[in-house]
Amino acid sequence: MKLETTRFGVIDIREEEVITMPLGMPGFSDQKQFVLLDHKPDSPFQWYQSVQDPSLAFVVTDPFLFKPDYAVNLHKIVEELGWDQDVSGNHLKLYAVVNIPPGSPEKTTANLIGPVLMNLVTHEAVQVIIPDSRYSHKFPLA
């Protein structure tokens, strides 16, 4: 399948690479399909590119790379979502949405209070809000 993007031009993706977000991203509820694209080889960042809007892409990262003791109660979230997969396995993946201020990459932050949780079996994802979190939506990465 051909995907037109403003950052990468036209790229080929496989249908099974498409991740469906039934609720969309907060503020972008009409955007329901995304694909993960690598930023650069060996980069800790990826692009979470909208399939529907060529100009919409979020920078995401594995939060454990920057906060090894990051802890989220996945069992509770998975139960609330009705996902039946074994959360102790490799069926789930968390991503933190990253904010890189223009001209100030040293002020890059990650949203640890609202990670994107992906179900790698069903190719579904949801941005969850961790209630009563000790984390910040502006966790410094630099």
Predicted regions and their residues:
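Short active-site loop/helix that positions an aromatic residue
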Residues: 76-87
